[in-house]
Each structure stands twice: as structure tokens, then as C-alpha cells.
Amino acid sequence: MKKQNWLLLLVILLLPAESMIAKKKTEKSDREIWCEIMYRMATPVLKNMSDGLLKQNMLVELSPTWDGRNKEVTYMECFGRLMAGLAPWLSLPDDDTAEGIQREQLREWALNSYKQAVDPAAPDYLLWRQEGRTLVDAAYIAESFLRGYDALWMPLDSVTKQRYINEFTQLRRVDPSYSNWLLFSATVESFLRKAGAPSDTYRISSSLRKIEEWYVGDGWYSDGPRFAFDYYNSFVIHPMYIEALEVITEAGKREKIGNMPGCNYHEAIRRAQRFGVILERLISPEGTLPVFGRSITYRTGSLQTLALLAWRNWLPVELSNGQVRAAMTAVIRRMFGDGRNFNTAGFLTLGFNGSQPGISDYYTNNGSLYMASLAFLPLGLSADDPFWTDASQSWTSKKAWEGEEFPKDHSYHKK
């Protein structure tokens, strides 16, 4: 009897240890979490579009205040925005890991989808020739080529490439609004320039000089003549400004655009670094972000500038790899961990955290929401990059609210 009791006690004592070992074995790494969510987000779009079935199978959701424009803009928004976020990940070399197999599959679907997008005879030919809105999402497609030039642009056949050049060129018919839209023209023309096609340098240079004029200080640009407090500095302005500058100044080798001073590539990166510091400090200890400004349904797209800094190895000294990864993972898990942001067909649903169509703007459909993919740019870093391998660290607000030492904040001024 005593022997049985001792055995029972031993089993009870060992159970927690075995449970902890099992938990450790099944606990996913931050990168695995990101890959899983990105794959889930991308698969319904690319799998369907690669077969010419996106328009047929996408469960489309429109804002209750939809302004009546052609709802087929949905498909271009969905594809373009997704690819702008996905391009760096798909640019990694193939390998035989579980992630590598998924990545190779997504790239295959993506390359087929790119062909569908510009083939007038294809069922998923996108809405290139109608609606001024087309300029916006053509710019995200162009941005995906800038971000994944060798992996996504170069493998396309010559007919498909020429079709893209033709479609991008005819978008000069669109007169961009006096706002962040100037960067959409600049991005399209910057890609044409990089691809060796005829480009309109004035559309690039005039847009960049205007954005430069709209810099208001401390890492913030005004979205047009009047400042608005929203996330458009992350959705559009910092990333597209830097990427267009990178093309036209040859990554800072040229100090001027034409005969005009200003628009300094390296200074633009420093401003983005300051904005990245601000974004990191906005992430709460619980992994939430403040909900303010228009287009809040773009969810994690608000983190794009921070994601860009991490992917390009431009994080400022104030931010470590471990704290940025931990902070971004906390937001991504909080936003997508329970699946509530996907509809019954697997596409993103209108809302911020769940189905909340009432908060969407008059121009918003659920294709618009694939801006969320822009937070996943660091997946373009290999799995052994320090961003992924450095030890996880508490981010600024978590340290502050837990009573730990944390760095003071300082405004940024050009030196």
C-alpha cells in the first residue's frame, strides 16, 4: 500500500513537469505566429486569383456608406495591398522547411495572379481603365514590384511585363488629389523608371518636393495642406516617400532631384526612425494601439513604418530588435489570434477587431483591409536574422507601466 502511495505521489509530482515540456514543444515562435497569420490572410486571395476565381469566390463587403463607385475596385485593392506587404517574404530563397513550402506555394500563386491581373481575356483582369481610385492600388502593385523586384517582377514573361508597363502608363490620365495621393503617382513612375520603361520624372520630383514641403516636424508629415492626426504617415507617406526617393536619388547617391535641393533620402529615413519610435511607444502593455483617425479598419497597416525600419535594418538606436518584435507580435496576436477578423469565406471582414462595418469609411470595402499585410514586412528577413533570433524584450510602454526603467523621449530636429 505504501509503495502504491509513493508511486501515486511521484506521478503527481511529475505531471506539471511533463506538462511544461509539452507546452514548450508546442509553443510557437514569434516568426511561426507571423507566418501562420500571413499565410491565412494571403491564401484565399492568391489561390483563387491564380485560378481566375477571385471575382467569383471573394465574399465582398462594402461600407454601409459606400459612395456608389464600381465595386470591382475591391479586387484590385485586395491584390495590390496584399502583395505590397507580402513581397519581401516571397523574395526569400526556397528551402524545405514548413515555412519554405508555404512561401513557395504563395509565390507560385502570386506569379499566376500577376498575370491574371493584366490579361484582358482573364476572368480576374483588374479594373485598370475605370475609376480614379485605380491609381491608389496600382501604386501598391508597383510597390510590390519595387520590394520584390527579382522574385516577383523578373520572372514574369515579356508579354505580362509589357502589359503592366502599358497599364501603369495609362494611369497618367488620373489627376491625383492634393494629398498622399501624390505619392501614388510617384510610386508608379518610380517603378517604371527602375524597370527601364519611359517614366515621367516630373510626376516623381514634383510629388516628392510637395511632400517635403508638408513635413511638419518630429517625424510627422501633413497629409495635404492641413494636418490630420491619423495613421496615414504609416499607411502611405513615410514608406512611399522613402522608396520613391530611393529610386530617383539612387539610394542617396544624388543629393538633389533635378536642380532642386531638399528631399534628402537619408534625412527621410531619420524622420521615419523618429516616427517609428513614436509608433513603438503607442503600443500598450496589452498589445493594443490607440484607435484614432480615418481608415482605422486597415488594422495592423498602422505599423508599416515600424515594419519597414525593421525589414531594412534601419531601426534607430532607441529600439532593439527584441523589443520591436515583441511589441509587434503582441499587436498581431491581439488582432488576428482569435480569427474574428476573417469572414466565413476566409477573407478579411469590415471592422477593426471583428465585424464592425459601421466604422468603415465611404471608400472602404474589405479589399481595402489588406493594408494589414504591410505590418509583415520583417518576414522578408531570414529566420536567422537578429530581428528574429534576439531575445524578446519588453517594449517601452510595458516597461513604463510595470515600473521598470525606460528611456526618456526626445523630439527630433534635423542636425
Q: Where do the language-model regions lie?
A:
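Aromatic-lined, polymer-binding surfaces characteristic
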Residues: Y75, L86-W89, R103-E255, P261-I269, ...
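Non-catalytic carbohydrate-binding regions of carbohydrate-active enzymes
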Residues: C263, E267-D361, D390-S394
